[in-house]
Amino acid sequence: MKRLLWIDISKGLAILFVAYFHFFATYFQHGVLPPPDWSNLAAGTLTTLRLAWFKISGLGFHAVGVFIILSGWTLMQSTARRAENGGIAWGPWYWARFMRLYPMYWVAHLVYLVSPFIARLEPVDDRIILSLLGLRFIDIEMNFMYLNAAWWYFAMLIQFYLIFPLLFWTARRVGPWWFLFIGCAAGFLARYVLLVPWPQNGLWVLGGFAICRLPEFALGMSLAMWHKQSPARQEWFLLRGAGFVAGLILYPAALQLYHGLYEYIFVDFATGTCCMLEIVGIAGFISLFDSPAKLFGLVGLYSYGLYLTHQPYVIWLGLRIREVPVWGFLLICIPTLAVLSAWGMLLEKGTNALVNKLLSLKRPAPA
């Protein structure tokens, strides 16, 4: 089964949206929009564009939910393909996942420690040990957002990988619809417990306890199974506009779920799904054009490196350009994201090459 380019494009769009959001949130943290001006057509148009920019920019963190969905999708797809080719040895599977995740994660720590143009907002202390292990959910208030807040995602991801054999077995046994129902039920129950009868630090719901984000991950796994059953039908819905329109219609309702404790149980799943429909719909449009498709697909292929390294850079720069007008920020944003994408790509590609080289040295030579 060949790699789906539109999945890589979607990952590229998602990580760029996340990086842009962190840049925007730092730059505009204390910013105030000018008063609306509806005095004439030109002023009204400018006011509308300004409000739309502000609202859409503030939704960038929803793209993290898109990453969770696409992670479930790609992991299910690759593991199912391996199962069809002769079964799965879970020991080597775990080792492959470990070597895929941890080396680049450690390189991101090294980059944080030695790179210039980095926002270092906390001291480097003994908490870095738990961070290097990925166990940022231990003493969650002190460790989950330590040094680089984006690394919380890694702590959640390793939990999903730990339980993935159980998820995979369940999904294959009960089918996509029942699996999605079970995943949503478990995730919503966990969120209910941590929000209502036994209120805990919100970082557990964010991803410190991965089951709270299982609905998105299960949706991705179910989408992978549905795609295998009927790829043409699913791609028509997701890539040819129908899914984009559906997401656009449902998004306002999803945003209303922020306005209540019980509603908040469902908000991450709802906003992540709507954002996924928008991003994948845009990816479908981009995939019609060869050069942009290759460019965004390349960013998506190496999105892991960009995700792990971008935030301290955009915070550093964002703090220094707060007096720049919005149009100046947007002009600065484009080359900044391009440079960070290239840097993340270089780091991830180099790390993977080094790991593969070291592993090949340990393999016995054929007789």
What are these regions (language model features)?
Residues 1-189, 320-367:
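Membrane-cytosol interface segments of multi-pass membrane proteins
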Residues 217, 244-353:
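Alpha-helical transmembrane segments of multi-pass integral membrane proteins
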Residues 16-23, 132-139, 183-196, 245-258, ...:
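Aromatic-anchored segments of alpha-helical transmembrane domains
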Residues 76, 161-164, 169, 217-231:
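Internal transmembrane alpha-helix with an interfacial aromatic "cap," most often the third helix
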Residues 5, 52-64, 143-156, 194-219, ...:
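Interfacial loop-to-helix transition and helix-capping segments at the boundaries
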Residues 108-111, 132-137, 191-195, 212-226:
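Hydrophobic, membrane-facing alpha-helical anchors
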Residues 86-91, 111-120, 136-146, 197-204, ...:
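Short juxtamembrane and helix-loop transition motifs at transmembrane-helix boundaries
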Residues 170-184, 226-249:
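Hydrophobic alpha-helical segments of polytopic membrane proteins
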